Design a protein with these regions (language model features):
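Solvent-exposed loop/turn elements at secondary-structure boundaries
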Residues: 361-389, 394-555, 695, 747, ...
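Gram-negative outer-membrane beta-barrel transporters
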Residues: 501-661
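Extracytoplasmic gating/loop element in the C-terminal half of outer-membrane beta-barrel translocons
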Residues: 649-767, 772, 794-837
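Acidic, glycine-rich flexible loop segments
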Residues: 3-8, 14-182, 196, 208-214, ...
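Transmembrane beta-barrel strands of outer-membrane/channel proteins
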Residues: 24-30, 74-78, 151-155, 202-208, ...
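Hydrophobic, lipid-facing positions within transmembrane beta-strands of outer-membrane proteins
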Residues: 5-7, 55-59, 133-137, 182-188, ...
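Short loop/turn motifs that connect adjacent beta-strands in outer-membrane beta-barrel proteins
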Residues: 1-2, 16-21, 66-69, 146, ...
Length: 857
């Protein structure tokens, strides 16, 4: 197998038989089945949950078309989930100042109307929703005794709204776009026996994916920071103004196996062909960023971004780059039964990725890159080279009766690169599509009419796509698909009537993705030197930006590894009790998590305290070091007559999960090192270093815009900062060090779930039907005690920024008695010696019930 470096899922679909069988099932949950409030760590309570509905209805049917020859199996499922967004109203959950937010929205409407535009957006995203329909059909054909064929078709139609309001981000309803996805798949399989010792498996498939974002009316994105304790976003989300992805994927697989004595030799090939069309034009209607509400009302734009296709080249502003690629795989494997109780499997696989199309040539950039000594061209493709994957595995049934099995293996696994990254190279050549990103906003005003989003001004922005200030994406000439070396060793054994498994897994990165921005250049100074601090531990390198907005290059890195060790015990009793307990310890370190579909974002949001083009190896965004699972299921059979064949059984289960909290990082809100990335991890200063920062004038006073009065002096900020540094659990023990990316985890989390179901059968004619009714209470822990079961960022990771750095506005009264404004670069710590570093997952921190019902016939 290939195409993955993490885990692979092999699914077996149901088939029809000579008898008609089917099922109807449903899952249901509403707002009355979710706890109204939950208690936080500080004793405060959450807001009411609000209304919600979550249901799924499905049906299956299978049976014969021609008895013993041709069968069918069909399924349908519809799901609908709607719930209130807790952060869209002024209920205390949001950190946004709703009064100021409404004033901003009123001004947007007024200014837009003055330009002939009616803005219909409203604050908040009251309803969140996910809808989906799933349909499937499978045909099985017993051609003859030696040949079996199947044809499988599936279709999924889904819609979900995204970018909705959070605790620190309030958005308008048109900012929260609909993500619509339609997926069709057709799979044909033919399994054949050839003679007495040979067989062949043939597999062909086609998958079509049509993804599209549907924003509101065309409107620029207006982003205002520091609206209370968060950010307000109005209009279309910048990455969704023009965003659609079409994918067609074709695969062919053939495995020919020869059984020769103790050897089963497989020769095979797996071919993949891809066709992509990716409409992606960020900032098509313009994106205007303001540092605070005061700047917004004054029209002081902090940052302006704009992008569109060059109509003279692409023919339209909404240009869809298209390209095709493939990956050809060939392999040989031998499964050797060395003895009756020892199997050895070994083989070799070669994969060859290939791109059939070439990005457009940007001659000016290619010359520029050559002058810089870079081996880069916009019209450069991935080199066609085989990627080898040798593998070896074994299974040793040591005592020949399955009471002690040792198994393991080692090998190389070749994956793919998300092709949406490759599509960036076709979009961002600086020829057919251009983008601007500037902090030099003099003369720029907000254009609310989407057709007037950009007006070329040679003194501010270039007028031709070949000029600089462009965003360029390119490949390193030796860029490879991802590869991992992986090894595992496990022991399965029985002891005291209990089944045990002990397993260890280790993975080492051979090729992984890293994004470098060639447009940032080291100045030769450190941050401490730039600030004039002689004995200051923050010695991160300083940068300046080059001639382009960004030059993002996909390269490979071999740093990174992960390992895990686990132990699991399972025991079943004759009276119907099943017990399971497991513990897993793991560690995962990466250079870049690659969690964004935009290549530039994978550079910008890869937090570092050093060179962003050579980031330090750090814990993964998804590193959960400890996990404990315990389950107990009691099955009660109410049939006292053992001879009865109709089930009448109740199952009661308790499932406990305990794990380390989500990883988190602390960064400085600003651009410390001048690279434009805003991704600088915080240096944790000592008290003496904080005092030196204050003495050097690096803290900027907080002042009142109306009166010019100082509301928080640099000295007060320094004292409050020291108080926070001495009280935060991780920070206080790492003074004089950098906060490494994801170096700490949130508090340990405990969750107990309860499951109850009853299954009973009844006769309908000659057949037996079954009805199963179930109730799940998820996070039952919270129902037992309101102080338990809180969850921080379920399944994700957190970033916190208690300290700000940048060009701060300072107001003071001049000699004439007027309040005047000036700017000073430095730090501000506006908290009062404390900073809340807990971001609760509102839904997952509540107990919730789910009802299930299923009829089988």
């Amino acid at each position: 197998q290939s195409g993955f470096t993490g885990g692979a899922i092999n699914a077996i679909t149901k088939s029809g038989t000579n008898e008609f069988h089917g099922s109807v099932y449903s899952y249901f949950q509403n707002g009355d089945m979710v706890s109204n409030k939950y208690e936080k760590h500080d004793g405060s309570e959450s807001a009411d949950y609000g209304d919600m509905t979550d249901w799924t209805l499905g049906a299956t049917l299978g049976g014969p078309i021609v008895k013993d020859k041709l069968f069918f199996f069909a399924n349908f499922e519809r799901s609908k989930k709607e719930y209130d967004n807790a952060f869209s109203t002024n209920n205390g959950m949001s950190k946004i100042d709703f009064g100021v937010a409404n004033q901003i929205l009123d001004k947007v409407r007024t200014d837009a109307a003055a330009q002939g535009v009616t803005y219909r957006g409203t604050l908040g995203t009251p309803k969140e929703y996910t809808y989906s329909d799933k349909v499937g059909l499978k045909l099985d054909w017993n051609i003859n005794d030696r040949n079996h064929a199947s044809l499988r078709w599936s279709f999924v139609d889904a819609k979900q709204n995204n970018k909705t309001a959070t605790a620190k981000n309030l958005v308008t309803n048109d900012y929260a776009f609909d993500f619509c996805s339609k997926t069709s798949a057709l799979v044909f399989e033919l399994n054949s026996r050839i003679g007495d010792n040979m067989s062949n498996e043939f597999h062909a498939s086609w998958t079509s994916v049509r993804d599209k974002r549907n924003p509101g009316d065309p409107f620029p994105m207006i982003q205002i920071s520091n609206v209370g304790g968060g950010t307000l976003c109005i209009g279309n989300e910048r990455s969704s103004m023009a965003n659609a992805l079409d994918q067609d994927i074709y695969t062919l697989t053939d495995n020919f196996t020869i059984n020769a004595g103790r050897h089963a030799i497989t020769l095979g090939t797996h071919e993949e062909f891809y066709k992509f069309g990716n409409l992606f034009c960020q900032d098509l209607y313009g994106t205007y960023e303001f540092s605070n509400p005061t700047d917004f009302f004054a029209g002081n734009i902090n940052r302006f971004r704009y992008g569109q296709a060059v109509e003279s080249v692409a023919g339209t502003k909404n240009w869809t780059p298209k390209f095709s690629a493939g990956q050809f795989g060939f392999y040989v494997q031998d499964k050797w039964a060395v003895t009756d109780n020892f199997d050895l499997t070994y083989g070799l696989r070669a994969d060859m990725p290939i791109m059939f199309d070439t990005p457009l040539e940007n001659g000016e950039f290619n010359v520029y890159a050559a002058q810089k000594g870079w081996n880069l061209k916009t019209n450069q493709k991935i080199a066609v080279k085989p990627m080898w994957s040798p593998r070896l595995g074994f299974r040793w049934n040591t005592l020949k009766h399955n009471s002690l099995i040792v198994r393991g293996g080692v090998g190389v696994f070749t994956g793919r690169v998300p092709f949406v990254w490759i599509s960036n190279n076709f979009s961002n050549t600086g020829v057919a599509q251009f983008s601007y990103n500037t902090y030099n906003t003099d003369g720029i005003t907000v254009q609310y009419n989407a057709n007037n989003a950009y007006k070329a001004d040679p003194t501010v922005n270039p007028t031709t796509p070949a000029q600089k200030l462009q965003t360029i994406n390119a490949f390193d000439k030796d860029f490879k698909f991802s590869q991992q070396l992986r090894a595992n060793l496990a022991v399965d054994f029985k002891l005291l009537g209990t089944n045990w498994t002990v397993e260890g897994i280790y993975s080492k990165t051979l090729n992984d993705m890293i994004v470098k921005n060639y447009n940032v250049i080291e100045t030769g100074k450190t941050f401490a030197q730039a600030q004039g601090l002689a004995d200051f531990g923050d010695v991160r390198p300083m940068f300046k930006r080059g001639d382009y907005s960004g030059i993002y290059v996909l390269e490979n890195v071999s740093k990174g590894y992960s390992y895990s060790a686990s132990v699991k015990a399972e025991k079943s009793f004759d009276f119907g009790l099943d017990l399971m307990a497991s513990y897993t310890y793991g560690l995962s370190k990466t250079i870049n998590n690659g969690s964004s579909s935009v290549v530039a974002s994978n550079w910008q949001y890869n937090y570092t305290h050093g060179n962003p083009n050579s980031p330090e190896l750090a814990k993964s965004n998804f590193n959960i070091p400890h996990q404990v699972m315990v389950s107990a299921y009691q099955h009660i059979n109410w049939n006292h007559n053992p001879g009865r064949t109709i089930d009448n059984k109740t199952t009661i289960g308790l499932i406990y999960t305990g794990n380390s909290g989500s990883p988190y990082s602390i960064y400085v809100n600003g651009d410390l090192n001048g690279d434009g990335g805003y991704n600088d991890l915080m240096y944790i200063p000592t008290d003496a270093e904080v005092d030196a920062m204050v003495a050097k004038g690096l803290f900027v006073p907080v002042t009142n815009k109306k009166t010019g009065a100082v509301t928080k002096t640099p000295e007060q900020q320094g004292e409050d900062f020291k108080q926070w540094l001495s009280s935060e659990k991780y920070v206080k023990n790492h003074r004089g060090q950098y906060f490494e990316r994801n170096c700490d985890n949130e508090d340990w989390e405990n969750r107990l779930d309860l499951h109850v179901d009853h299954k009973f059968g009844f006769k309908w004619g000659k057949d037996i039907r079954y009805i199963q009714i179930g109730l799940d209470i998820i996070n039952f822990t919270k129902m037992l005690n309101k102080k338990w079961g809180a969850t921080l960022s379920q399944g994700g990771f957190n970033y916190y920024s208690p300290l700000s750095y940048g060009s701060m506005k300072v107001y003071k009264v001049n000699n004439a008695g007027a309040v005047v404004e000036s700017k000073k670069t430095g730090y501000q710590f506006t908290n009062k010696g404390s900073y809340d570093m807990r971001s609760y997952s509102d839904y997952y921190s509540r107990w919730r019930m789910q009802l299930t019902a299923k009829l089988t016939f």
